[in-house]
């Protein structure tokens, strides 16, 4: 192969790489505080909108200040869809065993995920989430606690969402994930093409002494039952 041909190929690769980086940078909408994290944000939005045909308006977040974003949990694709519909970074509470997955651990740490130990008292995670809300951040969680497919009976909501809403005074913004082909799967759901939809609902506010009613209403909203 001639030097000229090798040079032309190298120039073409560099050109394609630069074009891709510009495309990712133009697609990102949330500022994660770093060039590469913002590029990943752009990649995720393209993936969810093109491959998973995501239908969703931007989540109705306040321009500044805290909020809790909560959703039903049907697959490992759910958090990617929520990020793709958010104009602000989301800090997810995730299970400790998921947080410690090889390779992904560095990414989870970089985007501020908060690990929750499910085998013991989750107080440390709740306090970390409360501090994030006090700093004006957006915290996202799945109050059912684990993945639940539509054919299973509803799971009772974890009371941590009520604690965070009460302690921070932040609005709770419910979402319902629908149209996922890979229900019940984690990594596999990301690569099974879906017609994903995020349904938005009005914010909820927890009033003093109203925890049970709040959780019941949130359960109905997330499950549609």
Describe each model-derived feature in a short phrase.
Residues 7-8, 16-17, 124-225:
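Non-catalytic C-terminal accessory region of glycerolipid acyltransferases
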Residues 15-38:
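Transmembrane-cytosolic junction motif
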Residues 26-27, 63-120:
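Catalytic core of membrane glycerolipid acyltransferases/transacylases, capturing the structured
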Residues 51, 60-62, 121, 184-186, ...:
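Hydrophobic/basic alpha-helical segments enriched in Actinobacteria
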Residues 30-73:
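Helix-to-loop junction immediately C-terminal to a conserved catalytic motif
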Residues 1-22:
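Terminal signal-anchor or tail-anchor transmembrane helices
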Residues 56, 101, 123-126:
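Structural motif corresponding to alpha-helix initiation and N-cap regions
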Residues 43-44, 110-116, 146-147:
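Short, basic, glycine/proline-bearing loop/turn elements
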